[in-house]
């Protein structure tokens, strides 16, 4: 066994010891401990790394776990913003799971590290009961692609999905802005860009597979309107989305 494999086994053992202690301390903890044993065995069978999400000292194991997705992980003050969102989720009675919360196992290459991050994030989504996704346009006119994947993952898993954006202008409006207003309707009434490529024109916040996919499942996409210099730090829309999620998850 190499050093990385030994480190993974030690990490798994420490997490199981922590969960066992919580199970002993809390009346309803044994069900949660059994749940994690099943997940560990599943991971072993698939040769995947076992991850148990952080559990507060005093927790209710019936608390809904919500995966907080968004491009905040790329910000220079990522830890600050992620911690603020997590604190708000806890105050609302939810247990937050967020990319960046857990240590990534050691790898030997960038490609392996990318795969390890993907595995950890997907494991958290499997453990989560719902998702709140930040669909604020990122590095372009559309939502962060990683967040879009995570939203689709949770939709496909049949779990409750909620989202918000800090940009009020809809998708077609942002495409128009990208081309300096040079979009127009053709003879058949289809909106097209200067290259003749059709533009989605449904009045939605983003691609219809995201916005409509959320609403078809009973979720909501909250539309905020943050200042340009606070697109990824303004949490007003997140708070509104969080309140809706709490109500619907009861």
Question: Which residues does each PLM region occupy?
Answer:
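Short linear/disordered segments characteristic of secreted peptide precursors
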Residues: 8, 26-31, 44-46
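Aromatic (phenylalanine/tyrosine) cluster motif
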Residues: 33, 49-50, 57, 61
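Hydrophobic, low-acid, alpha-helix-prone terminal segments
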Residues: 6-17, 27
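Conserved catalytic or regulatory cores that recognize and/or transform ribose-phosphate-containing ligands
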Residues: 56-250
């Amino acid at each position: 066994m190499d050093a990385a494999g030994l480190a993974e086994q030690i990490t798994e053992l420490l997490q199981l010891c922590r969960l066992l202690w919580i199970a002993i301390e809390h009346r309803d903890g044994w069900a949660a401990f059994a749940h994690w044993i099943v997940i560990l065995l599943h991971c072993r069978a698939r040769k995947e790394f076992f991850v148990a999400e952080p559990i507060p000292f005093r927790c209710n194991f019936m608390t809904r776990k919500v995966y907080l997705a968004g491009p905040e992980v790329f910000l220079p003050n990522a830890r600050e913003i992620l911690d603020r969102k997590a604190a708000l989720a806890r105050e609302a009675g939810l247990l937050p799971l967020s990319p960046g919360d857990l240590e990534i196992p050691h790898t030997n290459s960038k490609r392996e590290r990318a795969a390890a991050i993907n595995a950890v994030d997907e494991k958290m989504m499997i453990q989560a009961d719902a998702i709140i996704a930040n669909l604020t346009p990122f590095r372009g006119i559309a939502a962060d692609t990683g967040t879009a994947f995570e939203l689709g993952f949770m939709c496909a898993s049949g779990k409750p999905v909620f989202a918000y954006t800090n940009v009020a202008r809809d998708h077609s409006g942002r495409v128009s802005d990208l081309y300096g207003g040079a979009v127009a309707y053709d003879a058949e009434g289809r909106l097209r860009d200067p290259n003749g490529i059709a533009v989605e024109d449904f009045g939605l916040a983003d691609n219809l597979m995201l916005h409509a996919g959320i609403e078809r499942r009973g979720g909501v996409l909250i539309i905020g309107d943050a200042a340009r210099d606070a697109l990824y730090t303004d949490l007003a829309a997140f708070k509104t989305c969080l309140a809706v999620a709490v109500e619907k998850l009861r």
